[in-house]
């Protein structure tokens, strides 16, 4: 049961962090969908770096456009590097290119982009239980649905689809 308790704590604290940042960004005019999209792009970069670090795998991301190239930067340099990374990755002729199809940065204020990157960098995502990642994703979609004033807040993402995304 110890693992379960840890998962719940991790899940709750991470959901809180991710949601808190969504609220902050919404105040800056960055919509929830844009935030989740950027989070996905950045998480992919971070998990690629973890794969290299922990398992000695070769990076799927071209040199000069990897996670460590991004986290080292601040201010406009960070925004510029992130935008160049998205552009380059969207032009790849493989799965990476598919993942980053028409990818664009929607968090153009450096301070907020840095906050998202820092939050992602503070966690080890690759070794995190798939159920935890799925639960975080699910609860954030649900919370967004509850917080939407437009009434367009229903979400019907089937659990197996979420599983496929996070595993």
Enumerate the predicted regions with their spans.
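Non-catalytic, mostly N-terminal accessory regions of nucleic-acid modification and defense proteins
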Residues: 1-167
């Amino acid at each position: 049961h110890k693992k379960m308790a840890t998962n719940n704590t991790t899940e709750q604290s991470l959901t809180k962090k991710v949601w808190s940042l969504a609220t902050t960004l919404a105040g800056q005019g960055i919509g929830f969908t844009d935030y989740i999209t950027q989070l996905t792009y950045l998480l992919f970069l971070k998990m690629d770096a973890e794969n290299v670090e922990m398992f000695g795998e070769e990076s799927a991301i071209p040199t000069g456009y990897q996670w460590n190239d991004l986290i080292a930067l601040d201010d406009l340099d960070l925004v510029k590097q992130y935008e160049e990374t998205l552009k380059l990755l969207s032009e790849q002729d493989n799965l990476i290119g598919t993942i980053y199809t028409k990818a664009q940065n929607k968090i153009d204020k450096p301070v907020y982009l840095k906050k998202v990157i820092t939050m992602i960098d503070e966690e080890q995502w690759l070794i995190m239980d798939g159920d935890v990642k799925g639960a975080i994703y699910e609860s954030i979609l649900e919370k967004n649905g509850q917080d939407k004033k437009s009434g367009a807040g229903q979400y019907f993402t089937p659990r197996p689809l979420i599983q496929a995304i996070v595993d």
